[in-house]
């Protein structure tokens, strides 16, 4: 697990970045996935986020915007139903390379236009 967060009252504020710093000892490659759970209160058909990795100096090492379709054209959820939440396992980056040892901060930014974003229960960024 690289980072995780459960959201108070299932609400995620727009500029409440989810982040964690890890110490990378040697050159490594990760297959990164995001597990995210939504309640029935989530009002949108998709979810947008920005994933950023910062190097030891605080400079952006990699950054990418993502948009995931959560519901079909009729508004039905695509994700697996677990514990009354719709849970998705989403690929973030296959073979994400960190070439130099050091401390790296992984950050996920809610990139949806409305704050707070209602219906987000929890998320976990993990290496496969």
What annotation goes with each model-predicted range?
Residues 98-128:
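Internal, hydrophobic beta-strand segments that form the core of beta-sheet-rich folds
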Residues 42-44, 58-61:
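Mid-length scaffold segments of soluble, non-membrane domains
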Residues 55-59, 74:
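Solvent-exposed strand-loop boundary residues in beta-sheet-rich modules
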Residues 34-42:
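Short amphipathic, basic-aromatic surface patches that mediate peripheral association
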Residues 65-97:
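An anionic, turn-rich surface loop/hairpin at beta-sheet edges
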Residues 1-25:
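Transition segment at domain starts
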Residues 43-49, 119-120:
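Short coil-to-beta strand junction motifs in C2/discoidin
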Residues 25-32, 101-102:
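Extended extracellular/luminal ectodomain segments enriched in beta-structured repeat modules
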